Amino acid sequence: DEVYEFTWVGKKASIIEANKPIRKTLRPCKEESVNWDNTENLYIEGDNLEVLKLLQESYLNKVKMIYIDPPYNTGNDFIYNDDFKMTEKEYAEESGEFDEDGNRMFRNTDSNGRFHSDWCSMIYPRLLLARNLLTDDGVIFISIDDNEIENLKKICDEVFGESNFINIISVKTKDSAG
């Protein structure tokens, strides 16, 4: 049977990553906190994939709103990785473009996949885990630019359901030339 699905090199591994157990715990830093005894707010610092896994037990279906600002995959240098492209050789190996004898199985004229696959594999497990935290009427807001918006929309449709999409809010960042 044929089915419609959005897939990429590394998708199966990203599902495994989302479900991989973690052996860490969150530790409160009371001395660094403001009004620790009076506030109900949490500031959590750490790898966001690990933190999302840790929050599953205490906050499953309890979060009303999530805001994320993932890397935009622009290739620029930031504190975090913002360049999720594979080399052409890495992409050919992982996509099955060649058989075990080195024969080309198909001609991939669209090399775009190698620039987007790693980014999709980075965001997918995080969105799967974020979905588990949301209440039935919870919402997620995601900041993104034009580099990955189409892929993000497809992943969100899969993870959250197409019918749950509300809107895209565009922000004008600079005047166009002309």
Where on the chain are the PLM-derived regions?
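DnaQ-like (DEDDh/DEDDy) 3′-5′ exonuclease domain used for proofreading
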Residues: D1-Y67, Y72-P125
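Conserved Class I SAM-dependent methyltransferase catalytic core
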Residues: F106-S170
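Flexible, glycine-/basic-rich loop-and-beta segments that form/coincide
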Residues: A177-G178
